[in-house]
């Protein structure tokens, strides 16, 4: 588990710092974590140690000082295990610290105690049967240092005694070329769309999706392409998993260790969960999602705050009003501009988005008009 999580953090820092994708072969044996080994110079190595410290909460024991002098991957793993042992000796609970997937500002740290993460992964395996068939493997397309990936590609394979094939550094379609009957594919809707576009699925494959809503049309197309079944897990970085469903258009079923509270929220024991969405209950443990509470959309598994995107784009001279919606799996924008401002405005908006917004928050399609699209009742509506 620790090795899988550590490799995921290393890959993320390599991509963030120098836009390099480290293949699986780079981690064969016990590679050195330096410039000659995995390509981290002294400054990049410090940044990586900081990311590892924050995720594993190493400051509680001070073990990051010892990680700094360890030259190899296995040395880092040993020190992280020592951190866990020190906390256990003090009767303290270890935790992983995830980050919200927000596209604006600094992502918030969200600590999750390891026992609760293990409980959720065990429930997914034991209660929900989300494990590979005997002899099958978990095929991971999502990073393990994100909550969804941690649960399903780090903890669940270990609990189920299943092999893991980590394809986060490979094209999504490679999952179909290497898959065997009984395998379980872990991916976000954005990645599932790429898998669906790659052709027919080999027989006997099952899947799990999370990180963003799974569109019904995509779900139907995956089943038509030969995917045996798909389970969508609903949750958030702030809460962990909350519910799941096994058919498009169905209500979600609350996970068994959670409960509906008196105010129609959700509780984990006595603690209310900080829900990100409005829920409508259709039964004692079944609910449907009716939209975000914070005016955010999920684009490629990343929370995009529409208010921030609007404020960035509306600052462009000539923009009088602007509306944002999902168009497929990316944002689209409808722009009302001054009569003499449309020429060149799209190029300027794209440049402003490139400079001021993360990739998921940048609209891919722009449309211009004299007024924002409204229904007869004066409510905002979609556009082609």
UniProtKB/Swiss-Prot annotation:
Gene3D superfamilies: 3.30.300.30, N-terminal domain of ligase-like
Domain of life the protein comes from: Bacteria
Its EC number(s): 6.2.1.12
Pfam families to which the protein is assigned, alphabetical: AMP-binding, AMP-binding_C
Catalytic activity of the protein: (E)-4-coumarate + ATP + CoA = (E)-4-coumaroyl-CoA + AMP + diphosphate
Single GO MF annotation: ATP binding
Family: Belongs to the ATP-dependent AMP-binding enzyme family.
Function in brief: Converts p-coumaric acid into p-coumaryl CoA. This is necessary for the activation of the photoactive yellow protein (PYP) chromophore.
UniProt name for this protein: 4-coumarate--CoA ligase
Gene: pcl
